[in-house]
């Protein structure tokens, strides 16, 4: 089967979050199952800096963006059996970052138009065209409406994956003519219109042959007003083509037996290396080196979505316990300042690292006893799976992908891979936090059993890619 991905970012070339991880891992895994896979990405300046001497220049053409003709340079690099095609236009993509510009609408309108026209020029007409998030959500519409006259495109099936419904791509209706070069018929009849704006995500949901999200629970949640971001009505209407598939993680990278970023390796049968990593991490961040104290790790953006309003609200209560907390992340300045203040007030209990460091993140995943992730909503989440891979038990809000991947501890059966709370409140977060500390302190045997269960869970992309393969096959 020929499968083509189109996305705004993809590891190792460009990455700001989970979308980049998916594009870096899923195509590679699909190749192992015998599929022919291509990926189209923007050619950013950070891509040029890392891979500029490895990519191959193929050709260039021009694409109409409204009344203008814009340059499209095409580059290619084959990595892990996947053909990566890059769309090069320095005006749009050499900005020093991936998102956040005033003209993001124009940038990604250009990218989508160029990607659709590129398929024919590289002679890669896929059986399935898989697009991701709002940045590429207009592509199913373009294939079926603007470019329907291209005979080779008529049998292409399209899949849209929603990684985060909060970001929908809402723009003035004038964009249809001024950038996409199409008429207003589908806006006038309401197909593309939402809240008197052009809504790219709505277009993708309606025009794609299948819509997936990154966990089964999130697929159900976004059909409700609480999580639907005002598109729940549309998602209920299209629920027959909505599927949730949990993301995987790259188990070759996140492997406690071989991880090059760790000083001490370990496995589920011998966790002594994990304890050595704990001591090394405590020493590195300036906390007292103690084996007996529960070490709680946090690696996250510091935002309300990630639940840090609750964490800051309860942090004083947390620090009254015999516990150590290591935080790594940046985000809302108010949360950064709060953690910095508590770090100064409790230097023996809290290490607040307001930055991002890949090596330190890996050490926190591997050395902590508990990983705190109380997200308000979480489409999938990767950190909890990474933590479990290293025998670190997650404490999560029971929502989205966190619900699907973390089995809460059952005191009667001893089953469980972490701890969870259902009611999103400071009281229940603190209650669950204390329960986790109590189990760590008073029942080492149960704790070790949970660590083993967590490390045995299969979060590899092999499982997820088989589910996607079945989904693609069902469309043909």
From Swiss-Prot:
Q: Which pathway, metabolic or otherwise, does it act in?
A: Glycan biosynthesis; glycogen biosynthesis
Function in brief: Synthesizes alpha-1,4-glucan chains using ADP-glucose.
Picking any one GO biological process from the record gives: glycogen biosynthetic process
Can you tell me which residues bind ADP-alpha-D-glucose? 15
Q: Into which family does the record put it?
A: Belongs to the glycosyltransferase 1 family. Bacterial/plant glycogen synthase subfamily.
Which EC class is the enzyme in?
A: transferase
Q: What is its EC number?
A: 2.4.1.21
Q: Which Pfam families match?
A: Glyco_transf_5, Glycos_transf_1
Reaction equation(s) it catalyzes: [(1->4)-alpha-D-glucosyl](n) + ADP-alpha-D-glucose = [(1->4)-alpha-D-glucosyl](n+1) + ADP + H(+)
Q: Kindly provide the name given to this protein in its UniProt entry.
A: Glycogen synthase
What are the alphabetically sorted keywords of the record?
Answer: Glycogen biosynthesis, Glycosyltransferase, Transferase
- UniProt lists the gene as glgA
């Amino acid at each position: 089967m020929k499968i083509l991905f189109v996305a705004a970012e993809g590891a190792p070339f460009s990455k700001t979050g989970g979308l980049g991880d998916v594009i870096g891992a899923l195509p590679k895994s699909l190749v192992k199952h015998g599929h022919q896979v291509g990926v189209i990405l923007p050619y950013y300046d950070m891509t040029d800096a890392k891979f500029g001497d490895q990519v191959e220049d193929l050709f260039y053409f021009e694409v109409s963006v409204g009344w203008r003709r814009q340059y499209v340079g095409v580059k290619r690099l084959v990595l892990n059996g996947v053909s990566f095609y890059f769309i090069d236009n320095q005006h749009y993509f050499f900005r020093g970052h991936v998102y956040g510009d005033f003209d993001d609408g124009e940038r990604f309108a250009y990218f989508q138009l160029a990607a659709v026209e590129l398929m024919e020029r590289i002679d890669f007409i896929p059986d399935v065209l898989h697009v991701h998030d709002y940045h590429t959500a207009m592509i199913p519409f373009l294939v079926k409406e603007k470019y329907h006259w291209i005979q080779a495109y008529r049998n292409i099936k399209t899949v849209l994956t929603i990684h985060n419904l909060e970001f929908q791509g809402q723009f003035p209706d004038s964009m249809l003519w001024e950038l996409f070069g199409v008429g207003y018929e589908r806006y006038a009849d309401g197909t593309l219109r939402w809240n008197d704006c052009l809504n790219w995500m709505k277009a993708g949901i309606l025009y794609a042959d299948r819509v997936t999200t990154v966990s089964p629970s999130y697929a159900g949640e976004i059909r409700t007003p609480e999580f639907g971001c005002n598109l729940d009505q549309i998602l209920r209407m299209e629920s027959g083509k909505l599927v949730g598939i949990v993301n995987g993680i790259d188990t070759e990278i996140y492997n406690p037996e071989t991880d090059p970023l760790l000083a001490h390796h370990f496995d589920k049968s011998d966790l002594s290396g994990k304890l050595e990593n704990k001591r090394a991490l405590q020493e590195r961040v300036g906390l007292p080196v103690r084996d007996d104290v529960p070490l709680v790790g946090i690696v996250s953006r510091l935002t309300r979505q990630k639940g840090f309003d609750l964490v800051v609200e309860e942090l004083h209560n947390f620090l009254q316990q015999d516990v150590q907390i290591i935080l790594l992340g940046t985000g809302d300045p108010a949360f950064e300042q709060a953690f910095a203040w508590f770090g100064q007030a409790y230097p023996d209990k809290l290490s607040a690292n307001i930055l991002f460091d890949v090596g330190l993140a890996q050490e926190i995943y591997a050395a902590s006893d508990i990983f705190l992730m109380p997200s308000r909503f979480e489409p999938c989440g990767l950190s909890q799976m990474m933590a479990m891979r290293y025998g670190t038990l997650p404490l999560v809000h029971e929502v989205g992908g966190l619900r699907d991947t973390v089995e809460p501890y059952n005191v009667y059966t001893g089953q469980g891979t972490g701890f969870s709370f259902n009611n999103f409140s400071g009281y229940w977060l603190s209650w669950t936090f204390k329960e986790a500390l109590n189990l760590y302190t008073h029942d080492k045997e149960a704790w070790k059993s949970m660590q083993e269960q967590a490390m045995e869970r299969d979060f590899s992309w092999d499982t997820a890619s088989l589910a996607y393969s079945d989904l693609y096959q069902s469309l043909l």
